[in-house]
Amino acid sequence: GFLDVLKGVGKAALGAVTHHINNLVNQQ
């Protein structure tokens, strides 16, 4: 359903943001 799609997009976005933050932290 539509909510499932939103949840999937939210998880993907959160995962991407978390991955990006981890990269920034690892560079320091």
From Swiss-Prot:
Its biological purpose: Has antimicrobial activity.
Biological-process GO terms, alphabetical: defense response
GO cellular component, one term: extracellular region
Tissue specificity statement from the Swiss-Prot or TrEMBL entry: Expressed by the skin glands.
UniProt-annotated location(s): Secreted
Family: Belongs to the frog skin active peptide (FSAP) family. Cruzioseptin subfamily.
Keyword Secreted: yes
Keywords of the record: Amphibian defense peptide, Antimicrobial, Secreted
Subcellular location, principal: secreted
Organism domain of life: Eukaryota
Record's keyword annotation contains Phosphoprotein: no
UniProt-recorded name of the protein: Cruzioseptin-10
